[in-house]
């Protein structure tokens, strides 16, 4: 064998040896990495931390969406009222959130989630009493704060153009400190409406407990009833009734921003309702969130569509303002049972709410 052949054979052997060594070490490294990763992922503490992290992120994302409903309310209220009252309405919406956040943190959260059947115990500034079940207490406080602010904002729209700013501050204080926390304690806080023990009032009377998944009653109904009482006490807006006593429509100064406000509220409702799942880490959570998204959207569409149709038949042309309110009526109506009803049921609920809204406006006028 000549010198050139020996050299070539040597190089071939070296290349083969290097290839075998590379494959062997790569396989060992891959097995070690796989073993390490699977061990890390399979650790119960790691899985729990990951689950809590995902749930917390989803809860805070939903809280941001609900917070974004505040400009939606501001635009709707400003668009549906006269231009001279715009600054007053916008200031009230800022006050709702600023005062509401401080007061709910100071005392409202304790009254809502503290121990007690009728009302919780106030834990001034102290959040250590609450066990979030894996969710950070401070994050859950923020989530509940934006719901409290929503209840207060509803009152602003109903009493627009005839409420002194100073008196509206009193409303905000009572809603944030007492009314919303007490009604919330009866339900989400584990109070008497949620007491499923044998012999309890709900089980003895109805055979079941109260169900309000995302706040049709706790948030929207509370705000709505306060608004109705306030509007009844204050009376109609100036120019609402003529000398003959007949009701006159007071057109909003800018339906464009009112429509934009409804779109923002619709968008924010996808945090309001699905966010109440308070979890997003499992397949069951993902399915539940998806179902709530669907029922929420269908109810809104049905409410708006049938409000449009009925207003068209009654008045000879479709009404934009009634259609916008029909969408909101459908959203409010589905909020309690969005996790339980079928998609078809959501359409029925939205339809009823959209039609009922039109006749309710006529009745109140």
Regions found by a protein language model. Name each.
Residues 2-365:
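Hydrophobic alpha-helical transmembrane bundles of multi-pass membrane proteins
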